[in-house]
Swiss-Prot record:
<dbReference type="InterPro" id="IPR019772">
    <property type="entry name" value="Ferrochelatase_AS"/>
</dbReference>
<protein>
    <recommendedName>
        <fullName>Ferrochelatase</fullName>
        <ecNumber>4.98.1.1</ecNumber>
    </recommendedName>
</protein>
<dbReference type="InterPro" id="IPR033659">
    <property type="entry name" value="Ferrochelatase_N"/>
</dbReference>
<dbReference type="GO" id="GO:0046872">
    <property type="term" value="F:metal ion binding"/>
</dbReference>
<dbReference type="Pfam" id="PF00762">
    <property type="entry name" value="Ferrochelatase"/>
</dbReference>
<keyword id="KW-0350">Heme biosynthesis</keyword>
<feature type="binding site">
    <location>
        <position position="210"/>
    </location>
    <ligand>
        <name>Fe cation</name>
    </ligand>
</feature>
<keyword id="KW-0627">Porphyrin biosynthesis</keyword>
<dbReference type="InterPro" id="IPR033644">
    <property type="entry name" value="Ferrochelatase_C"/>
</dbReference>
<comment type="similarity">
    <text>Belongs to the ferrochelatase family.</text>
</comment>
<keyword id="KW-0963">Cytoplasm</keyword>
<dbReference type="InterPro" id="IPR001015">
    <property type="entry name" value="Ferrochelatase"/>
</dbReference>
<feature type="binding site">
    <location>
        <position position="291"/>
    </location>
    <ligand>
        <name>Fe cation</name>
    </ligand>
</feature>
<comment type="function">
    <text>Catalyzes the ferrous insertion into protoporphyrin IX.</text>
</comment>
<keyword id="KW-0479">Metal-binding</keyword>
<dbReference type="GO" id="GO:0005737">
    <property type="term" value="C:cytoplasm"/>
</dbReference>
<comment type="pathway">
    <text>Porphyrin-containing compound metabolism; protoheme biosynthesis; protoheme from protoporphyrin-IX: step 1/1.</text>
</comment>
Length: 364
């Protein structure tokens, strides 16, 4: 096997610290053609769908990829903007803002970039770009506040797979979760309070998280517990009583039982229980995306209003708001402790260039 080297490296050059923020991914366009390879990559991940591989291969390629790309493309069209996919540009904005924040302390010694677990920008390509810039210490932050094997661990799998192809590996640190990180809770609470200041409160506040199969919880995945802890900490910070908020789970897929209560079923039931107004916030989504803008902002609105509800409001994700960037930057700084880089003088760089030149074979 031929391992990938670092041809741009020169002895004595400045080592840099890299911060790689990642998210799930997005198709290249809201079209059936673009959705098929994206969904195939996503749904082929054994961390996402824990089903015997041969059986799932037949289901995925024989059924799902024949019909789902068209339906998904129609949904993506409703959230697509001039800048493209919301998840893509929000993550890009977050990375840019984090970089600006960190450079106040680290200057040019730090490199910040972003990648997607599925689709583009591909994780392996971004890691290579960062290595070529001199990154020798790499901190990875998957933007999933609550850990799950289907998201956070999958990101680590992809990173580890990339490392198997490299000759020179960077020092690595990997943030697995931040569901109870106080600055994150504060940023989320302030986002909700900002909405309340503009629109007032509803009868009920729902914290809706992406669901996972119940089987994953029973097999030891801590995601369910971390979601409930985030909800509890937010409720305490906001001064909410137990009857003023709910934790629900959305986006279930297939016939298997997932974490409950389901967001959509809750929306259909609440008006019959006397709840006429609701506000929904999604603490597990660092950026607005299809699941928040379309599924929560539109689809679940219809369920609630058609069931007798009178007022429904989606509270947007934290995206690149300053409080969120401050929280993520502090989280990163906490995890960079103990790492340092050495500034390279002009004289040292000239010496390094000379050494590199002497080490290269002579031209004929």
């Amino acid at each position: 096997m031929k391992y990938q080297g670092s041809p741009g490296f020169s002895h004595g050059q400045a080592d840099k610290i890299g911060v790689l923020v990642t998210n799930l991914g997005t198709p290249e366009a809201p079209t059936k053609k673009a959705l098929k390879p994206y969904l195939k990559e996503f749904l082929s991940d054994p961390r996402v769908v824990e089903v015997p591989r041969l059986l799932w291969f037949l289901i995925l390629n024989g059924v799902i990829l024949r019909f789902r790309p068209k339906r998904s493309a129609e949904a993506y069209k409703t959230v697509w903007t001039d800048r493209g996919s919301p998840l893509l540009f929000h993550t890009q904005d977050q990375a840019s803002a984090i970089e600006a924040k960190l450079k106040q302390t680290w200057g040019d010694n730090i490199v910040v970039d972003f990648a997607m677990r599925y689709g583009n920008p591909a994780l392996s390509e971004v890691v290579e770009k960062m290595m070529q810039k001199g990154v020798r210490k790499l901190l990875v932050l998957p933007l999933y506040p609550q850990y799950s094997a289907s998201t956070t661990a999958s990101t680590f799998d992809a990173l580890a797979k990339d490392f198997t192809k490299r000759r020179w590996l960077p020092e690595l640190r990997f943030i697995t979760h931040y569901h109870d990180f106080s600055p994150f809770i504060e940023a989320a609470a302030q986002r909700i309070e900002k909405h309340w200041d503009a629109h007032g409160r509803a009868d009920k506040l729902l914290f809706s998280y992406h669901g996972i199969p119940l089987r994953y919880l029973k097999n030891g995945d801590p995601y369910h517990c971390e979601c409930y802890k985030t909800s509890r900490l937010l409720a305490e910070r906001l001064g909410l009583g137990k009857d003023e908020y709910l934790t629900t789970f959305q986006s279930r897929f297939g016939r298997e039982e997932w974490l409950q209560p389901y967001t959509d079923m809750t929306m259909k039931a609440l008006p019959g229980k006397g709840v006429k107004s609701v506000q929904v916030f999604c603490p597990g989504f660092s950026s607005d995306c299809l699941e928040t803008v379309e599924e929560i902002g539109e689809e679940n609105r219809e369920y609630f209003m058609e069931s007798g509800g009178e007022r429904y409001e989606y509270i947007s994700a934290l995206n690149a708001e300053s409080g969120h960037i401050d929280a993520l930057s502090q989280l990163i700084e906490n995890n960079l402790q103990g790492w340092s880089v050495e500034d390279v003088t002009e004289q040292r760089q000239q010496r390094a260039d000379q050494v590199k030149k002497q080490s290269l074979p002579y031209d004929d």
